[in-house]
Amino acid sequence: QYLGELGADIRVFRNDQISLDELIALKPDHLVISPGPGEPLKDGGVSPEAIKHFTGKIPVLGVCLGHQCLGAVYGGKVDRASRLMHGKTSPVTHNGQGIFKDIPTPFEAMRYHSLVVYDPIPAELEVIAVTPEEEIMGLKHRQHPTYGVQFQPESILTEHGKQLLKN
């Protein structure tokens, strides 16, 4: 909804109902890999290969499962979280750059997940947001505008979520 309010021309596809070739043929100018249940490489459908293909070509944002796909694509460890976070908010501290530009730190973010990306983070990625418990809430590719957030920026209970998507 926020992306539509921001003027984006949105096309939505289930990750298991579109191929990479079909996605490429759409010639997107941005790509959002959205939430979903399951494990990133097992249940992510086209998402991991879409991240690999589009990184460096267009801006990419992975949300929740998409964030986990980003971590996994580059060899990061995705595993069970130390605590389940379904419908709970947490303060998130960030670096104030890229998707976090003009967003106060910390801010409250809505979370719905039972998996997280763990340290060590692959060399291609950097951690850009964490909780007070040091859970990774944001990743960025070091060379390209490819980001991942573990929380739900689209939730009304995430402060500044619309600004994050605008960035």
What function would you assign to each model-found segment?
Residues 1-6:
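Short, charged N-terminal beta->alpha structural module
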Residues 9-15:
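Short hydrophobic/Thr-rich beta-strand motif most characteristic of the beta2 strand and flanking loop
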Residues 17-22:
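Short acidic active-site motifs
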Residues 23, 27-29, 153:
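Proline-aspartate-enriched helix->loop->beta-strand connector
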Residues 28-102, 108, 165-166:
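Cysteine-nucleophile active-site neighborhood
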Residues 64, 113, 152:
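Histidine-centered divalent metal-coordination motifs
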Residues 96-144:
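Catalytic beta-strand/loop cores that center a nucleophilic Ser/Cys/Thr
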Residues 156-167:
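Acyltransferase
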